[in-house]
């Protein structure tokens, strides 16, 4: 599920038309994760560090787990994700592959230095997703996804999930406004809703609220998370974000560092 959400976001989990003016005129790349996220500048990597919040709502000690680092190619598409602890020890890593048009086509995952699975997505000659196959840590086929549809920005709109024995398990349906993810619904094999989510944004395209509702036979649980953006860099990209629960209590502060490509590196 983690990988299909990543694919859905285009990262993962992200892809709109590349609007960079200095790309080659004959480039086949149509999609860009960074453009989808409405981030500005030629970003090479993004590092997010989470911090605890004290009783007064001020930033406290750094969380021991986990610092996340996303690396991007020259087209603004994610090619590697790394999670490490406060000492810099890598805990998990995912290396992504991309289609020539920029679509996310798979990941090879490791955890604590050992294989933890992979995913490969097939793209047809029209540049459309067709099938997504996962493998477990031993390389054996695991769950797979069919009936994958996508929007004009290369983001996954819907899919059907089957287990390794080809038994239909669940399906998902996403909703977007242009390239902004607005919500997602999953249903079980008989069509009953399992979960729904919804997102809200400010006028900069920054997510300010995310709600997730989980439905079981006996209970329905909704979790609402809200965000404020405290600081931005000179390009307008946020560098500090505070997270709140549904009661308005600050629960986490994330500091973000961008590495931008130097002009000479683009030549």
Predicted features by range, described:
Residues 18-267:
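Buried hydrophobic residues that stabilize the cores of well-folded domains
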């Amino acid at each position: 599920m983690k990988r299909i959400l990543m694919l859905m976001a285009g990262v993962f989990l992200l892809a709109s038309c590349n609007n960079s003016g200095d790309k080659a005129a004959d480039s086949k790349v149509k999609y860009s994760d960074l453009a989808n996220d409405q981030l500005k500048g030629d970003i090479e990597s993004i590092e997010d560090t989470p911090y605890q919040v004290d009783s007064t709502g001020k930033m406290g000690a750094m969380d021991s787990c986990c610092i996340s680092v996303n690396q991007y190619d020259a087209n603004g598409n994610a090619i590697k994700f790394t999670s490490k602890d406060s000492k810099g020890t890598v805990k998990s890593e995912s290396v992504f592959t991309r289609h020539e048009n920029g679509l996310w086509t798979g990941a090879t995952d490791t955890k604590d230095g050992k294989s933890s699975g992979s995913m490969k997505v097939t793209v047809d000659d029209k540049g459309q997703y067709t099938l997504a196959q996962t493998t477990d840590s031993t390389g054996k086929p695991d769950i797979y996804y069919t009936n994958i549809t996508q929007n004009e920005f290369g983001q996954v709109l819907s899919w059907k999930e089957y287990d390794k024995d080809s038994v239909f398990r669940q399906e998902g349906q996403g909703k977007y406004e242009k390239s902004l993810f607005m919500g997602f619904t999953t249903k079980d094999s008989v069509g009953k809703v399992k979960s729904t989510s919804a997102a809200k944004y400010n006028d900069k395209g920054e997510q300010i609220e995310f709600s997730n509702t989980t439905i079981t036979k006996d209970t329905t649980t909704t979790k609402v998370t809200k965000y404020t953006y405290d600081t931005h860099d000179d390009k307008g990209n946020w560098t500090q974000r505070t997270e709140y629960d549904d009661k308005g209590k600050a629960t986490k502060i994330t500091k973000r560092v961008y590495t931008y490509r130097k002009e000479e590196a683009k030549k």
